[in-house]
């Protein structure tokens, strides 16, 4: 088999029109789960990102990070922005089941979305970055793949060709304990209270935080998939870029994960951004500098179309 690099890098220099629609991709009882699809005009095939929003596993929805989705679509990348079950009502691994299904759903309907199965990646921000990476690393995990495609549908799995992460919570257990230490300090800030509560709501136990953990899975030597990945990180971000007091690794969490991922055979880049993150406040995606452009450029180098 040979591969042909898609002309996404050139698309970064120009924009295209796109269409937006909400579709129901999954239903739990009488509750539909929607995806907002941003689809470039033209014939394709286009790369596609299944987009996983942040919000400490409990908050936000498919509309929250629309600036990123709009930019991707305007530069020739299909954006499939998900709603999924909230950790406020459905604990781990419910959201992972929805996301795993969504990847398979997009593959099943690839021609309708002007893409192909081998052009599909995952993208996520904060807790969404954690979920995206965990689905990518464990595409065949029977817990995550528990929701079947419709009867008679062709078989598809949740393997992806790329993972794009923005300040992911890559180590839920480490972040939980980091927040608890911050709360126990002198004159603690407010952010640890809400972070701890949402960890508790979604994970229910430290054992689950350790098990559903991309960082610790690699350090345990778990056999996982390691598709090409990129981590974008803002400066001054004490919620995602900190030294884990329980680890002997000399650097912060981003550097630790990059080292582990490469040791496992994966290719990953770490990009620091000229933006400030403030604990307890949602990031302003209009002030992330050239992050979106860098994402498009990275996809142009890493998403390929198999031929033959």
Locations of the language-model features?
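Primarily recognizes the serine-hydrolase "nucleophile elbow" in alpha/beta-hydrolase
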Residues: 104-181
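N-terminal cap/lid segment of alpha/beta-hydrolase-fold proteins
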Residues: 2-43
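Short amphipathic alpha-helix adjacent to the substrate-entry channel of hydrolases
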Residues: 63-81
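Short beta-strand element of the alpha/beta-hydrolase
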Residues: 45-55
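C-terminal catalytic histidine-bearing segment of alpha/beta-hydrolase fold enzymes
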Residues: 36, 230-242, 251, 255-308
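Mobile cap/lid helix-loop segments that gate and shape the active-site cleft of serine hydrolases
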Residues: 9-17, 144-149, 174-221
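Alpha/beta-hydrolase active-site loop
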Residues: 90-111
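The feature captures the conserved acid-bearing segment of alpha/beta-hydrolase catalytic domains
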Residues: 150-177, 201-244
């Amino acid at each position: 088999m040979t591969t042909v690099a898609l002309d996404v890098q050139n698309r970064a220099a120009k924009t295209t029109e796109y269409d937006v629609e909400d579709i129901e991709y999954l239903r739990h009882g009488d509750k539909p789960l929607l995806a907002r699809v941003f689809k470039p005009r033209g014939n394709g095939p286009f790369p596609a990102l299944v987009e996983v929003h942040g919000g400490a596993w409990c908050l936000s929805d498919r509309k929250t990070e629309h600036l990123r989705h709009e930019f991707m679509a305007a530069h020739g990348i299909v954006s499939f922005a998900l709603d999924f079950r909230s950790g406020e009502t459905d604990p781990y691994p419910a959201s992972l089941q929805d996301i795993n299904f969504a990847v398979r759903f997009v593959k099943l309907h690839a021609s309708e979305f002007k893409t192909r199965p081998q052009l599909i990646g995952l993208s996520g921000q904060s807790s969404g970055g954690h979920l995206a990476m965990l689905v990518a690393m464990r595409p065949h995990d029977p817990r995550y793949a528990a929701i079947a495609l419709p009867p008679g549908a062709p078989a598809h799995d949740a393997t992806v060709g790329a993972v794009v992460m923005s300040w992911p919570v890559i180590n839920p257990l480490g972040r939980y304990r980091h927040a608890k230490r911050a709360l126990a300090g002198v004159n603690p800030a407010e952010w640890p209270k809400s972070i701890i509560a949402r960890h508790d709501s979604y994970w229910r136990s430290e054992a689950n935080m350790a098990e559903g953990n991309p960082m610790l899975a690699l350090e345990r030597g778990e056999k996982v998939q390691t598709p090409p990945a990129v981590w974008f990180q803002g400066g001054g971000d004490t919620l995602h870029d900190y030294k884990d007091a329980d680890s002997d690794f000399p650097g912060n969490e981003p550097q630790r994960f990059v080292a582990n991922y490469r040791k496992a055979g994966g290719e990953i880049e770490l990009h620091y951004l000229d933006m400030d993150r403030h604990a307890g406040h949602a990031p302003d995606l209009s002030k992330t500098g050239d992050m979106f452009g860098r994402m498009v450029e990275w996809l142009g180098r890493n998403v390929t179309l198999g031929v033959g």
